[in-house]
Amino acid sequence: MERIKELRDLMSQSRTREILTTTTVDHMAIIKRYTSGRQEKNPALRMKWMMAMKYPITADKRIMEMIPERNEQGQTLWSKTNDAGSDRIMVSPLAVTWWNRNGPTAVTTHYPKVYKTYFEKVERLKNGTFGPVHFRNQIKIRRRVDTNPGHADLSAKEAQDVIMEVVFPNEVGAQLLTSESQLKITQEKKEELQDCKIAPLMVAYMLERELVRKTRFLPVAGGTSSVYIEVLHLTQGTCWEQMYAPGGEVRNDDIDQSLIIAARNIVRRATVSTDPLASLLEMCHSTQIGGIRMVDILKQNPTEEQAVDICKAAMGLKISSSFSFGGFTFKRTSGTSVRREEEILTGNLQTLKIQIHEGYEEFTIVGKRATAILRKATQRLVQLIISGKDEQSIAEAIIVAMVFSQEDCMIKAVRGDLNFMNRANQRLNPMHQLLRHFQKDAKILFQNWGIEPIDNIMGMTGILPDMTPSTEMSLRGIRISKTGVDEYSSTERIVVSIDRFLRVRDQRGNVLLSPEEVSETQGTEKLTITYSSSMMWEINGPESILVNTYQWIIKNWETVKIQWSQDPTILYNKIEFEPFQSLIPKAARAQYSGFVRTLFQQMRDVLGTFDTVQIIKLLPFAAAPPEQSRIQFSSLTVNVRGSGMRILIRGNSPVFNYNKTTKRLTVLGKDAGALMNDPDEGTTGIESAVLRGFLILGKENKRYGPALSISELGNLAKGEKANVLIGQGDVVLVMKRKRDSSILTDSQTATKRIRMATN
């Protein structure tokens, strides 16, 4: 206050004011500071000072022809005075206003296309809903987030090539655009931006925004998808939050979300197959998300989630060095440990073989709803500082940390036997056995852990065994903090290996991920996920299995047909029929299979009884191991729509309906495709069934007279030759076999020979 008074007194004297306003500043240090370098040292002041002048702007002389000297109010818009040091003229800010109102207009069609990301953002904000503001302590943790909604996922290099090709096509040699997405985007953008008058550099900047994911490491308390991050400054402060629902979704968020769902489904399905790794790769390669191949997305998308990382590891891609346990992400921040296998006894005297980590280590632990710092020594939790959204989340994190610490009192708290199984009915490894046990009920664990008095430290409280907060006592080594623990910020990726059971290890052999870590949460994907692999047909329930199985048979009918007549066993063992078995009542599988296989054998043996529709309809039932019996069926039952539905051996039913006129098959009312050749001729399909006992010699030979129909063939004597009309109106020359013994081989050669003879 004294100082201010003194200054006021000084300023009231006119001499002070005069000195301050008229004296030159000749202190060398000050002059140096404000004149060295091109960088403006005080931009705000400079701007104010410039705008206070009459003509703060310079412009090209041509402006004198384009703008009148005075506006409607008679104010001068430009001065004839030249700008010192250049041949430009001095212009008033009013000229800008005049230009904006009366200047020439440009074609605006390209603006929404070039500035697409901005236009879309405005729409999202206009349609978004801002809710009430709540004042409360915000536990924010820094996470790597996507700050750029609406982008494709190209790498910087790929984007650069696309931009050069679109914006500066003549500046460079032909760009090597390799990926599907690069080519698609380039073509789209070239069409959109034809005759675009916007400065190329600006177009390039804007294209970069559209093509590349921009991530930043920001403190976040709520949603982390890019449509929330773009309004972060509006939705959360230090002590307040504002509810917000975005006014639109963007494809990049949808891809991230759908990728996680697809990866989880694939890992879960692969776990239960005989060769999990091979199955996982087959599924990743045959799946599409929103019309883009999943493997292409995996290569470009930086999403870090357990299932996604397992898929990446299987493809030989690098992943983050952090590891996962109990659904939390662990990152070692200091210390080292060596592993030693040891047998330990649980409280139930069950022996467990556990890899004990010896040594002092510190970790950050980050989950969706709780974060923590853990310091541990060999089989000892030294300190756990934890923060979380609510009691439940904090408890989850404490259990994970206690199990991870491998403390003896945790192992001794086990009651009952540990025999948890994974989806493939294999026993879980011991650490996950313990985790599952305490996730079910941690009461004894918390009770046996022990409590200690605590010091009063700012921002820290204690937590009691019943998970209530306390300022006096706390579980041994455990404190609750008001501030969150930041996610691991590094984007470093490491080379990993994966074994056939999908366990991912770093180069030192530490397990980073395993299928046990994949979340069981079910979600609905935002983009269409198309699983072409038969292993995923069951994902959408029984109806989907039914439709997909029949679609597959129809799509591959040419090969199926040949196998049906030549190698039925190989056909019956096809993996594509596996999902279908789950629809057949267990008790009936073997009987149905035996019945259908016998029926098929009769078709092969008896001339002219080949019936395409019937083979397609019954084929999936022949896949189960057969049981020979005399039972005849007129219909077969499948369990769909919550009850048994019948497929008739002869004729149509709601489950399987073939329309002779349109030649299309509908399964449960859904179209399953068209049959190319007419299934009604008892003689079509591969003529092998018909031409048993005949040798196909080659193309038609007129010497042997007009073509006979198949029914007339029976009249030939052994060794006699004749032309015969088969299936699709082709004529071939055949000879009736002299010996019956070789009849079986005919069906195999017939197929090949008919092909050769008719081509």
UniProtKB/Swiss-Prot annotation:
In the record, biological process GO terms are:
7-methylguanosine mRNA capping; cap snatching; DNA-templated transcription; symbiont-mediated suppression of host gene expression; symbiont-mediated suppression of host mRNA transcription via inhibition of RNA polymerase II activity; viral RNA genome replication
- Is Transmembrane helix there in the keyword field? no
Per the UniProt record, the site (Avian adaptation) maps to 627
Q: Which GO terms describe its cellular component?
A: host cell nucleus; virion component
Q: Where is it mostly found?
A: virion
Motif Nuclear localization signal, which positions? 736-739
Q: Where in the cell is it found?
A: Virion; Host nucleus
Keyword RNA-binding annotated: no
Q: What quaternary arrangement does the UniProt entry report?
A: Influenza RNA polymerase is composed of three subunits: PB1, PB2 and PA. Interacts (via N-terminus) with PB1 (via C-terminus). Interacts with nucleoprotein NP (via N-terminus).
What is the designated name of this protein?
Polymerase basic protein 2
Source species: Influenza A virus (strain A/Equine/Prague/1/1956 H7N7)
